[in-house]
Design a protein with these regions (language model features):
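N-terminal nucleotide-binding beta1-loop-alpha1 segment
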Residues: 2-3, 7-31
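A short, N-terminal amphipathic alpha-helix
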Residues: 43-61
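Catalytic metal- and UDP-sugar-binding loop of GT-A-like glycosyltransferases, i.e.
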Residues: 116
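Conserved donor-nucleotide/metal-binding helix-loop-beta segment in metal-dependent transferases, i.e.
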Residues: 123-147
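Short, glycine-/small-residue-rich phosphate/pyrophosphate-handling segment
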Residues: 159-180
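Conserved alpha/beta core of the MobA/IspD/sugar-nucleotide pyrophosphorylase nucleotidyltransferase superfamily
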Residues: 176-235
């Protein structure tokens, strides 16, 4: 398994974790099928993942890791830049995988660990940096999504209880995570709400957002969307 740490800098060491998988048809963005074909959905997700990884590398933090299912490892090693650390998910279910990833990075000596998904290609660096800075005087940072989940979570110590008793992939994820954090007595900072591109209406919102954003935002996603438009015209 490839494991490439970022450069060690004086002072605080920060790690960004990205939950992702290889862009394989039938395994990624299945809720966009239809209207997309499995191949189109996988190609679009490839753009999402590459843009999220580029965003992470642009932060200049000491490590960017992609937390992935076992079957994705070799494919991601071929797709992603060598500066990216690949971390195979462990345990049973998403909660165990997130707990293990946070615990491992904190044990490696990182002072701040922030995790994002790979479903929001227009996300900017601002909420990630805000989440990291907030950990100076909070125990947990979190970014809610419009559908009741969260797209970001960060911590400076292993408060792994926040990943317990969560009904993952439901509209209750954010509320249950917050309830767990408050039950543990954690000080929580919430960054602004954002959205994941999971359903066809989200895809339309993404298209609209990209029209108003600078052309340098989400370049890989733009290329994938252009391919979709060309396919639609040809049919």
């Amino acid at each position: 398994m490839r494991r490439q740490a970022g450069a060690t800098l004086p002072g605080m060491r920060r790690a960004l974790l990205i939950v992702g998988k290889a862009p394989v048809p039938g395994q990624t963005k299945t809720r966009l099928v239809p209207p997309l074909s499995p191949e189109e959905a996988a190609d679009l997700y490839r753009g999402f993942l590459l843009d999220c990884v580029s965003l992470g590398l642009d932060l200049g933090w000491e490590r960017v890791s992609v937390v992935h299912p076992a079957w994705s490892g070799q494919l991601l090693a071929e797709l992603l830049p060598p500066r990216v650390t690949l971390v195979e998910q462990s345990g049973h279910g998403l909660g165990d995988a997130l707990s293990s990833a946070f615990e491992g990075h904190l044990a490696d000596g990182f002072d701040r660990v922030v995790l994002i998904g790979s479903d929001n290609p227009t996300l900017s660096r601002r909420p990630i940096r805000e989440a990291c800075d907030a950990l100076n005087d909070h125990d947990l940072s979190i970014g809610p999504t419009v559908d009741g989940g969260w797209y970001l979570i960060g911590m400076r110590a292993a408060h792994l209880g926040v990943f317990e008793n969560i009904e993952w992939s439901t509209p209750r994820v954010y509320a249950q995570t917050m309830a767990g954090a408050l039950g543990l007595g954690l000080r929580v900072h919430a960054v602004h709400e954002w959205y994941d591109v999971d359903e066809p209406p989200d895809l339309e919102r993404l298209r609209g957002d990209l029209l108003s954003l600078p052309s340098g935002v989400a370049p890989n996603t733009r290329v994938a969307l252009d391919r979709l438009s060309m396919t639609a015209v040809s049919h």
